[in-house]
Every structure is written in C-alpha cells, then in structure tokens.
Amino acid sequence: MTKNIGKITQIISAVVDVKFTNNGELPKILNALECYNDKQRIVLEVAQHIGDDTVRCIAMDSMEGLVRGVEVIDTGSPIRIPVGTETLGRIMNVVGEPIDGKGDIKSSNISSIYKPAPDFTHQSTECNILVTGIKVIDLLAPYTKGGKIGLFGGAGVGKTVLIMELINNVAKAHGGYTVFAGVGERTREGNDLYHEMIDSGVINLAEPEKSKVALVYGQMNEPPGARARVALSGLTIAESFRDMNEGQDVLFFVDNIFRFTQAGSEVSALLGRIPSAVGYQPTLATDMGELQERITSTKYGSITSVQAIYVPADDLTDPAPATSFAHLDATTVLSRQIAEFGIYPAVDPLDSNSQVLDPMIVGEEHYSVARQVQQVLQTYKSLQDIITILGMDELSEEDKLTVARARKIQRFLSQPFHVAEVFTGAAGKFVNLADTIAGFKGLVEGKYDDLPEAAFYMVGTIDEAIEKAQTLK
C-alpha cells in the first residue's frame, strides 16, 4: 500500500496546514499524521478539511524548528498508544512515547485513543461504597466504586495533595490497577508524584510488572493539542485494564480536568471557531461528554474516577466547572476559608455532596449522623453574623452549646495525611468508616462536651482525641 504523503504549507503556533496532492485522498478527521523535525518525530492530528487538498492539524509536540515544505505521512488511523500491563510503572506522553528514560514500552497491544462509550446493556448499576480512610469524605460525601468524583477548589487549597492521599490510601488497599493522567499541571508535581510512588512501593523499578500504576503526562509546558488529548490517552489505558482478564477494578485519576477544558478552548481559538460564554469553545459540553461517558463500569469491571477540577477565581458558576457537575456522582469542594483556619483537608462539609448519601445505601446510622453533623455546622454558620457583631455572650445557652460542638466537629474533620508527613511531621492516619461514624455520633450527642477543642485537631479516631485531651490538661 502506497503511503499518503503531503507537505506542510503553513505553520501558525500549534496549527499546521498540510497539502496532499499526489493522489487526491485526504486523511480522515482525527487521523494522526507524522513528520520529522531534525530526527524528532512530531505527531499532528487532523482537525479540519479546508479546500479539496488541504487539512488543518493540531500539533501534539513543540513546533520549534519546523518549516514549510517538510514531508508529512498519513498513518491511516487516529493516535494509537501501547496498553496493557507493560505500561505499569512507566510514564508516557500523549502519543504513547516513554518519557521516563527507561527504554521503549514493549507492548503487543496498541489501541486508538478514540473509542465509543460502552453500550447501555453492558453497563453496571451496582452501588458499593469505596472507603477512602478520610473522615470528612467517608462521612459526608462518600465515594462509590465505579463512580465519578470531582475535587473542586481554587489555586493552592490542596487538590493535588488530596489526590496523592487518595492514591496512597485507596490504591494500596485496593487490588486493581491505577492510571494517573497529569493534564496541564506543574511538571514539578508530576516529578514529585513519580518519586513518591517509587518510595511508597506503588511503582516497583526492579520489577515493573509488579507496579500498580501507569502514568500519562501532558504538563503545563506542552502545546494545547497534547493537553487536550492526554486525558483520552490515560482513559484508554484505564479501559484496557478494566476489560482485561474478564474484568478488573481500576482507579483513574485526572489532575486537572479544567486544564483539559482550557486546552480545548485554546485549540478551538487556534482553529478559528467562534467562542461561547466566557471565551470557552462552543463544543465544551460535547468535549466533556465524550470523555466522561467513557468513564464507566461494565458488568465485568469498574473505572472509579477521581478528577481534580480547578475553579477559576473560586467561581463555581464558571462554565468549565459547571459543565463537569452534571457528570459527577460525588463532589468534594475544597474551601479557601477552611484552609485559612488551618483545617486540612480543607473540604467544605456543607458544599460537598454525594448521590450515595442515602439510608438505603449507606445505612440509617451513617445517614443520620452525617445529617446531624451538617445540621450543627449549618446552625453555627447562620449564627456567625450574630457572634461577629454581638459576641458569644448574647447567644442562648442552647446556641452556645451548638457552637461549641460545631467548633469541635470542624476540628475533628481535620486529619493528618500520609503524603504530608514530610511537611507536617505528624504521622498520617487512615480511619475506618465504623470509627468515623462512632466518633461523630459521640460528638453530636454531647459525649465529649467536656473535652477541649484543641484535642480534636489533626487526630484520626475519637480515642486519639481523648488521649490528646489528657496531655493538654
């Protein structure tokens, strides 16, 4: 079969026009094209057909040094990446090339990054709770196996640290594989995460096949084409793990889904599409839907997805985070106000929610305790204006008691993380669900009204709080 060869006619930023004149056959939309820039392979993806013989493409790599007239070959298929157990313990880029300096990924399975979502008949509707060991999440916004979870927060409130703790707690306790897609985030964080995984044994350098995680990175310095597609590359690997050996449970982490939207917006502008609200691409909902609908559980295996979602200027009504809301089963909202109090994880207990916080699923006791905790915190929030203006002395005895309990609950929602041990010096805690429910039940019932507030700060179980109270006396 003769190769379909074209030539570059125009380069504007990350957009490249390629003219095919030899046999009049244009590459299909989304096909991958290859060219070489000083022996370096560059992949282009067909985005538009303009005229009879020219295609407009988005580059997946840096364009530095590329010139007009360079030959381009149509590969005849979309971007294809290696999948399967050979990817474990390795870092690859959007087009499946290893970037960890450890040689080629020798996989016999190569898969396109574009696939249809599983049929309705193949999807699973079972509902099982995924225990994370993080009190505030397990009690107030529990995660489901095979669910989609969003971590919402502005800059610097702890999204990446929370994701790293979830990888530490869930991936270690969980039998299946994990895929981490780094979408447009800091290269330093990607490097830190990789070395942390090596130190904790999640990645085994001596025997990579014993590793539990595959990493796909398209960091901040990459062109928008790579950042817009790297989540799909990560998802393709996650799907291959889910469907292998008659089904596996897979964890799929994306940090950060906002950068996926942001890159799509850049690509859209470069292609000359008219922007919609706040300058986002007109296809925002479609792009998000195509990614999210593939993250699902089948009758054989599940993909549980945790997605960090940056909130521009802390505005949850911005179209990018707002479009994500519709697809999620649980939302964990990180609050700057709570972080300023020094309470970590800075999860907002009133804004965060989960579809599975239902007595039919979590049980009557769990549901009742969670709602009582939220009620106490909501009452405290509504009393805050009175406290600010008139002071605590003007409150009724009942309200004073509610405020005291709420402040203890707030502090008890904090917890030392394993991955933050190097910063805090405090040993990380994994708290079982039964201990979490028992602790908060005692707090709302007033069993610990005599203990000082400070005893509840940065501890695991209620027994640790009681021990800490003894040392504070």
From Swiss-Prot:
Pfam families: ATP-synt_ab, ATP-synt_ab_N, ATP-synt_VA_C. This is ATP synthase subunit beta. Keywords: ATP synthesis, ATP-binding, Cell inner membrane, Cell membrane, CF(1), Hydrogen ion transport, Ion transport, Membrane, Nucleotide-binding, Translocase, Transport. InterPro entries: AAA+_ATPase, ATP-synt_VA_C, ATP_synth_F1_bsu, ATPase_a/bsu_AS, ATPase_alpha/beta_chains, ATPase_F1/V1/A1_a/bsu_N, ATPase_F1/V1/A1_a/bsu_N_sf, ATPase_F1/V1/A1_a/bsu_nucl-bd. It catalyses: ATP + H2O + 4 H(+)(in) = ADP + phosphate + 5 H(+)(out). The lineage of its organism: Bacteria, Pseudomonadati, Pseudomonadota, Alphaproteobacteria, Rickettsiales. It is found in: Cell inner membrane. ATP binds at residues 153-160. Its EC number is 7.1.2.2. GO terms for cellular component: plasma membrane; proton-transporting ATP synthase complex. It is an enzyme of class 7 (translocase). It comes from the Bacteria. It is a peripheral membrane protein. Its main location: membrane. GO terms for molecular function: ATP binding; ATP hydrolysis activity; proton-transporting ATP synthase activity, rotational mechanism. PROSITE patterns: ATPASE_ALPHA_BETA.
